[in-house]
Amino acid sequence: GYIVACIDPRGTAARGEEFRKCTYMQLGKLESDDMIAAAKWLATQPDVDVKNIGIWGWSYGGFMSSLCIMKGNDIFTTAIAVAPVTHYKYYDSIYTERYMRTPAENERGYEDNAPLNWADKLKGNLLICHGTADDNVHVQNTYELAERLVQANKQFDMAIYTNRNHSIFGGNTTL
């Protein structure tokens, strides 16, 4: 059987302004810490197989799943990252600068939680999926992460969907 948990880490809505805004200038840091802590708590539950704890996400969720399997490589054994942001320097500046300011103003915020910079920490199974026509999270994010993983001699799986956009929809597309 399967157990599925949906975690609302710091930065999500419905828990007050301080909880929602605490990720400002450090996207990924607190959220990944919370996801890793939640997975570690789940691992203490009697029906959870600690050797098979996975995480998956799409877009920002892909950013989180790729970061979590690298930062939380002692708890997550598998991750699926679909259309992941792997470094905010490659993402839409209107969105990014609203939450992170510019790279010149917040270099540590950009670098410290970029999955690219954690690639050498990968231990488990990672599947990365991306459409080449994604105009939201450009496929460069995936290509750069793949290059870092190769340079770190890490095994991973990758599925590239030619001419598919951010939703990877249409034709015989399957994930």
Name every feature range the model reports, one short phrase each.
Residues 1-60, 86-87, 91-97:
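Cap/lid segment of the alpha/beta-hydrolase catalytic domain
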Residues 122, 128-130, 134:
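Short beta-strand/loop motif that positions the catalytic acidic residue
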Residues 22, 34, 77-78, 84-124, ...:
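Mobile cap/lid helix-loop segments that gate and shape the active-site cleft of serine hydrolases
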Residues 62-74:
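Short glycine-enriched nucleophile-adjacent loop
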Residues 132-135, 163-165:
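Acidic beta-to-alpha connecting loop that harbors the catalytic carboxylate
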Residues 127, 143, 150-175:
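C-terminal catalytic histidine-bearing segment of alpha/beta-hydrolase fold enzymes
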Residues 135-144:
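Conserved alpha/beta-hydrolase "acid-adjacent" motif
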